[in-house]
Curated annotation (Swiss-Prot):
Boundaries of every S4 RNA-binding domain copy: 105-169
Gene name of the record: rps4
Designated name of the protein: Small ribosomal subunit protein uS4
Species assigned in the record: Natronomonas pharaonis (strain ATCC 35678 / DSM 2160 / CIP 103997 / JCM 8858 / NBRC 14720 / NCIMB 2260 / Gabara)
GO CC annotation: small ribosomal subunit
Task performed by this protein: One of the primary rRNA binding proteins, it binds directly to 16S rRNA where it nucleates assembly of the body of the 30S subunit.
Subunit-level organization: Part of the 30S ribosomal subunit. Contacts protein S5. The interaction surface between S4 and S5 is involved in control of translational fidelity.
Record family assignment: Belongs to the universal ribosomal protein uS4 family.
Gene Ontology biological process terms from the UniProt entry: ribosomal small subunit biogenesis; translation
NCBIfam families: PRK04051.1, uS4_arch
Record PANTHER family: 30S 40S RIBOSOMAL PROTEIN (PTHR11831), 40S RIBOSOMAL PROTEIN S9 (PTHR11831:SF5)
InterPro entries: Ribosomal_uS4, Ribosomal_uS4_arc, Ribosomal_uS4_euk/arc, Ribosomal_uS4_N, S4_RNA-bd, S4_RNA-bd_sf
Amino acid sequence: MALGSNTKFYETPNHPFQGERIAEEGDLLSRYGLVNKEELWRAQSELRDYRREARRLIGEAQGDTVAAAEAGSEFLARLKRIGVLDDEDSLDDILSLDVTDILERRLQTVAYRKGLGNTPQQARQFIAHGHVTVNGARVSAPSYKVDVAEEGEIEFDETSPLADDLHPERAEGQ
């Protein structure tokens, strides 16, 4: 493939119009402050890849979950590190994940849940404008996947006007 080839990181729905799916997508877009359905489809594709890998690992172990867990220990460790799985979860639990589990790990959602914005949209704006840091580094991508270890390190940039507790745009809870 040539350099700079256009590749999509998501799959679109098979059927262009299904009223129930469209309504569900609209609800998720408003609840998580997503700008367009491409962001949702990207999360769904990521979840699909996780489930595909879990099925492959379980299949290679012929249904033996202990052997599958040994083979997929790195895969499980990665999902536990980013907070999609809990410490006691196994490969079988990956198959029961939902797209909301992926969307909850986005920087935009974590910043909103921490109270850095009054709405998910406001948290997204603060991130995009460079007001939020993770581990002291400015991150301007709302789709950044937050590790469990980084969750406590999300805060306003000290040079940002929003770092002042009395700033009018700060969340009321702080």
